[in-house]
Amino acid sequence: MNTSYNYHIVKSYDDELNRLVTEIIRMGEIAVAQLEAALDVVERRDDKAADRIVMNDEAIDALEQSISHDVMRLALRGPMARDLREILAGLRIPADIERIGDYAANVAKRSIALNTMPPLPQTASLRALGQLSAQAVRNSLLSYSNKDEQIATKVRENDARLDAQYTALFRELLTYMMEDTRNITPCIHLLFMAKNLERIGDHATNIAENVLFLLNGEQMLPPREKCDNTSNVNLD
């Protein structure tokens, strides 16, 4: 058996896996930058910057397509065990990142409509929720980059906190709408934006769970603690 040839085959495969992870992290960093920029334009009420964020979403979509092709090429080389889990994570994580980018673009898009109306005090609460979402995404990417089980577990646990903050903002906006019907239209935009941010947190948790799968295989995870109680809100 030509051990030198086998060594080069294995090293080439490992190098390609490492490049794949690097590309996925780069895609994630672009998505986080989009999210943080979207939160910024909501606060600054900057339509032109919001338009740029919406247009830049295409770059994330293109990266996902490119990464998907790379993953398929690696899969054809017959990965085993841990490498197969790397391949599966390489398919799943970019899909979550792509959705994060979509939700960030949606926040920016709705900010343009919101800018035609007087500013609302709840914008500050929306930003706080968005910062939690952005931190969740950053930490999930860090757990993937470093293969860190502890960070991934923490992201999963913190999703309940994000849900609770979303529910609090949901209540706040409903109350504000009931106090004055003129608040209904802008509050509805903020409700949709808040839901986008809550879903970003869910996708960050998906990434963290894929890291745990990558590290531990098919080990059963406990059910996520969910604190999104918006369906049970009673304002009577």
Curated annotation (Swiss-Prot):
GO terms for molecular function: protein homodimerization activity. Pfam families: PhoU. GO terms for biological process: intracellular phosphate ion homeostasis; negative regulation of phosphate metabolic process; negative regulation of phosphate transmembrane transport; phosphate ion transport. Its main location: cytoplasm. It is found in: Cytoplasm. Gene3D superfamilies: Phosphate transport system protein phou homolog 2, domain 2 (1.20.58.220). GO terms for cellular component: cytoplasm. InterPro entries: P_transport_PhoU, PhoU-like_sf, PhoU_dom. SUPFAM superfamilies: PhoU-like (SSF109755). The keyword Transmembrane does not apply. Keywords: Cytoplasm, Phosphate transport, Transport. Belongs to the PhoU family. Plays a role in the regulation of phosphate uptake. Homodimer. This is Phosphate-specific transport system accessory protein PhoU homolog.
